[in-house]
């Protein structure tokens, strides 16, 4: 039996989906927004791609099919929460445009945020050295190096984290979401 999400919402929740390369700043911005919304008394949950992969998608690899399955699992949980009035922040690479479009089309009140930084910047930010290993061919299926990252063509918000601070990004997020001070 396959469960699908419908756009009908019983609550006033929404899903803010942060997508971008590893190291672009998705988790940083999502966490900053999470803290701000909690401080304002909103019901909010943060679904981090790494945590979901560890807990709900353990055993999945990094093939396109496995990545798509992981994204669909995240979207399923996000949709359930949002339908009950929760603002859900999703921080996940979600590398394939078609899969992102599919899941966003079935989520209540979705906002796609493209967290963008050039490869040179994310490589410099990478304290584990994963990009350098991937560029040297030591890590197969690495998004942005040996596997594609398909940038959103028309995201709701495009944040260039190599050009703005976390505080500026947070302000743009709050303005876009209509959650002004």
Curated annotation (Swiss-Prot):
Question: Where does the record place the catalytic residues?
Answer: 94
Pathway linked to the protein? Sulfur metabolism; hydrogen sulfide biosynthesis; sulfite from sulfate: step 2/3
Q: Which domain of life is it from?
A: Bacteria
One of the entry's Gene Ontology molecular-function terms is: sulfate adenylyltransferase (ATP) activity
Q: Which GO terms describe its cellular component?
A: cytoplasm
Where is ATP bound in this sequence?
20-27
Write down the SUPFAM superfamilies for this protein, in alphabetical order.
Answer: P-loop containing nucleoside triphosphate hydrolases
Q: Does the keyword RNA-binding apply?
A: no
An example GO biological process term is: hydrogen sulfide biosynthetic process
**Which Enzyme Commission number(s) are listed?**
2.7.1.25
Q: Which UniProt keywords apply?
A: ATP-binding, Kinase, Nucleotide-binding, Phosphoprotein, Transferase
Annotated HAMAP family: Adenylyl_sulf_kinase
Q: What is this protein called?
A: Adenylyl-sulfate kinase
């Amino acid at each position: 039996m396959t469960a699908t999400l419908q756009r009908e919402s019983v609550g006033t929740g929404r899903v803010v989906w942060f997508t971008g390369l590893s190291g672009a700043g998705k988790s940083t911005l999502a966490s900053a927004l999470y803290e701000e919304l909690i401080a304002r008394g909103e019901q909010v949950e943060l679904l981090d791609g790494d945590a979901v992969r560890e807990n709900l998608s353990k055993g999945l690899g990094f093939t396109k099919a496995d990545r798509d399955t992981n994204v669909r699992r995240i979207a399923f949980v996000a949709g359930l929460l949002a339908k009950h009035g929760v603002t859900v922040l999703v921080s996940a690479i979600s590398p394939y445009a078609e899969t992102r479009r599919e899941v966003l089309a079935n989520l209540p009140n979705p906002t796609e945020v493209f967290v963008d930084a050039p490869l040179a910047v994310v490589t410099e930010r990478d304290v584990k050295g994963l990009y350098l290993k991937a560029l040297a061919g030591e890590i197969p299926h690495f998004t942005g190096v040996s596997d594609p990252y398909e940038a959103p063509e028309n995201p709701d918000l495009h944040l260039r984290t190599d050009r703005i601070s976390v505080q500026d990004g947070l302000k743009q997020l709050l303005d876009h979401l209509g959650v002004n001070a």
